[in-house]
Each structure stands twice: as structure tokens, then as C-alpha cells.
Amino acid sequence: MNSDILLFISFLVVYFVLPTTVKSQNLVKNSGFEVSYNLPEYWIITGPVISMQPQTAVDEQIRFEGKHSLKMESNNPNCHGRAVQTIDIKGNQTWFFKTRFRVKEVKSIDKSVLIRIKWFNGDKNIGYNYVYEIAGESDGWFLATNKIKPVTEATSAEISLEFRWSTGTIWWDDISMEPCPDEPARNVKVGTFHFRPPGPTVEKNVSLMGKLLDEAGAAGCGIVCLGEGWPTCNTNIGMKKHEANSIGGSASKMMAEKAKKYRMYIVSGLYNWDNDTLYNIAVLYNRQGNIQDIYKKVQLPDSETEAGAVPGNTFPVFITDFGKIGILICYDNFYPEVARNLALNGAEILFNPIWGDIRGTDSDVEKTIARSRAIDNGVYFVNSIYDGNTLIINPAGEILQETNKQGTLITATIDLNYNPPWDWVGNAGRGVWKDIWKKDRRVDLYGNPIKYDSPVLDKDKKDK
């Protein structure tokens, strides 16, 4: 494992495992339901419709720690009940929330287990967050955590532990909400090229792309995106067998050298023959100049299948030293499921080497689609296009940089912790969409994302 990935893992440990350097101060009263007489003190048991509430009581038999847990049990598939507690907070303070829960005969945790924190200014509901980071633990218990920055004007928070739309049983225990340090910015300078290699030879294309990579390196880019199948563009070679159409060819070697020289990640489209099997791929070169990983294009148009190309079958998400990225190639972007699977698997930036998109009658159709992919999934979106506009877009769908000028590099310094609340997302006030869509998504209907197993690369190409 290389030093860049170790650095990112160290960040995750500090961010998630060691969330506080502030003195521990749990604001939740009766956090383990120890002070209880059938129903827990300081908690209000309620729900939208009284007759639809699950049976709720303190349980002495099953608990995470201490003597008690809170048990909600239902034989009504349309049940909806809550345990609610309101605490006083400071709106300019970041908070670390956690709770443990376990379930029995509940079909979908995503659908039926909801942890919501509403923010109030006086009696006015001014926003909310979902707690959606859930990890399995031993003995059947789950740990739900989030590091949350409330709406600035908030003076109190309503913690709501909810069981809804299912039969079965849920137990709650070990709830806490404590002040913690603010999230540090996670800045990275991203770059992308609007460049259709002119040919007529691979050598000329490689030389010109090398000069553009020198420009990106001099600009201090942390990662840069290149176009689809660029080495053989305008050469009459296309996807045919050729040294340039391989991860060991001249174009790939040049990119590896530039990545190492400038300690810069490179995302590049490439055609790749593996013996007699042809793939349309995107390669991620790391800062050491090694091929870190490869994405194989999933959605192939007829022109590529007729050339003999074979599709990939997974949606990989790659860990860099600044965050997680996903890649989709050209026709992949015509299908919203590709971007959605990458986002569900954790991608924070989507890179898109793309020839073009000429659907519809609007000449700016690719802008609309690219902005939609960013907004729908709460991610940054960066393309490198031949026919259209090369774009850098933030999770709010705002175009940070764009160009359609041949041979141009555009850059933007982005913060991967950018996670703004939006008005009228969900059912009340302001919501953080990046959190909300992952929780409200009906996984019981749509299914889980397709998981990814990293391919085994040749030993000399894999990070040491």
C-alpha cells in the first residue's frame, strides 16, 4: 500500500474514529434508557398517527450496555413511531452524533430505520439532517454515526429515533451527541483538458498531450482528466490492435512519467487490448507514476461492439490521498444508473472522458446532463469532451469552469467537504441532499449498488 493511500486512511481514522479533541460532553439525557419506568425519562414516545405507533417500552433483556435499551415492536407493516428528545445547542458548533441499534425481522434498514436531527430556532423548524453512516458491529448491533454542522441559526436540536413501515422489532441504546472540531477543508486542485488530438500520427498526439500535462503539472493540479481513447484519435487506427492501444504502450508510458514527475494523479481514457480481448478503459495513474487501477466501460455503443470491444461489469471507486473518485466513459453517462452506482459506492468526484453527447435538440444538452449527474448524486463532476463543453461542476450543479476552446486546460480548487443545505429538500426546512438521498432512496425497490472487486494488475504496475 503506497504512502498516498496510507495518508487518506489516516485521515479517515482521525475524522471518523477519533472525532473529538474537545472534552467529552454528551448532551443527551438518559442516553442508555437507564432512568426508566416502563417508558424512558426525558424521551417522548410519539408518531404521526397514534394508532400506527409500534409498541414501545424499556427492555431489560436485550441491550448494548448497561441495564436497559428501548424496544419498538410492530406487527403492522405501515407502523411509524418515534422516540424524541430535544437538547439545547450552539448552531456554530459541529456535533458528533452516534447511536447503536439492532433489528429483528425488519426487511430493510434503509427503509424502516430512520435517525433524524431537526434544527430549531425557538419553535421554528429551520432544517434537518439524517444520520446515514451505518456500520455493522458484533452481537447483532449496528453503529450509526454522523459528524454534523447544524444550520447556523439553530438554538436547539430534536433527536428522533424512528421505526417505520415494517413489522418486526428494533432496539435502541447508547445515544450521544457531543461537540467536536469543525471539519477541515479537503481541498484538491482538479484539472481537465478540452483537447481533440489532431493526428495524423500517434506520436504527434502523444507529444501534444505531453505538453498539456506539463501545463497541468506546472499549474499544480492534484488530478487531471484526459479524453476518451485519445492516443489514436484522428489517426485512422481507432480501436485496432496497436501499441498505443494498450496499458503498456507509448501513450501510457508517457502518462506514467508525467504523473511521477509532477506527483499528479491522471485519469485517462484508453483503448486496451488484453491478448485478443478489447476493452474501452480509463486508467488511474497515481502520484508515483504507477497504474493504480482500471475502469472498464460498462455501456458500449454499437460502434464499439462491432469493433470487438467487451464491456466491463462493475463500478469501481478508487481511493486517492484526497478522497474517493469514480470514472465513467462517454456512453456510460447516458445511463443515470452508472453515476448513481458510483456515488452509492462512495465516489465524491466523477470523472468522465467523453467523445460527446448529441441527444435532443439543445446544443447544450451535455451541460444539462452533467449538471444533473452532479446534483442527483451530491458529487463533483468533471468531464473531458471533444464535441461540446468541458466542465467542472460542483455538487450544487454550479459550473465552476467550462471551455470549448481546443487545447485548453481548465482548473478549479474544490473542497470535498462542501456539503451545503438546500431549501425545500425533503419534507421540512433545509436539508443536506448528500445525506438525504442516500437515506430516503428505496433500496428495497431499487436494490443495492453493484459492488466492486479490484482487479489484479501485473506486479510491476501495482503499487508497492
Task: Provide a role label for each language-model segment.
Residues 273-348, 358-361, 368-372, 425-427:
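Active-site catalytic loop in hydrolytic enzyme cores
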Residues 1-25:
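Bacterial Sec-dependent N-terminal signal peptides
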Residues 214-287, 359-371, 376-377:
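Cys-nucleophile CN-hydrolase/nitrilase-fold catalytic domain and related Cys-dependent amidase chemistry
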Residues 23-189:
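Extracellular and organelle-lumenal recognition/adhesion modules and their flexible linkers in secreted
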Residues 139-142, 147, 384-464:
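C-terminal beta-strand edge segments of enzyme domains
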Residues 185-199, 203:
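Short beta-strand segments enriched in small/hydrophobic residues
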Residues 245-267, 330-411:
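CN hydrolase (nitrilase-like) catalytic-core segments centered on the catalytic cysteine
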